Amino acid sequence: MNLYPKTFISLILIFTFVHASNEVLVGETTHVRDGDTFEIENTPIRLAALDCPENNTPEGRYATKIAKQFVGSQASCELTGVKSYERFVGYCSINGEDYGEILISQSACKVWRKYDVWKRYTEL
């Protein structure tokens, strides 16, 4: 029995599924949990490729304070197809600006290159 064709077809299907999951979620930012997690109309989103300090540190409280400025703003997130702790992971913009770049430029978060799967922040 020749397994090559079955393996090849399986790999194509997996590749297609992984890259076809670019769902976009658009809506109002209704809640901020911390620097890298917020909600669009009660749907939790984890920002892809960012590492923000936790809320139990002064740096984490600063990141959350910056993020809370955008509650009520229009958000658009390209979801990666991955979930982390029941949160959708995505690259997001707020009012048309890259949300990750905003947080990085304010020194609220850092790029987590290991998880920058779409290489959005390789130049930062």
Show which residues each predicted segment covers.
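Small beta-barrel nucleic-acid-binding modules, primarily SNase/OB-fold domains
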Residues: N2, F15-L124
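Sec-dependent N-terminal signal peptides
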Residues: K6-T16
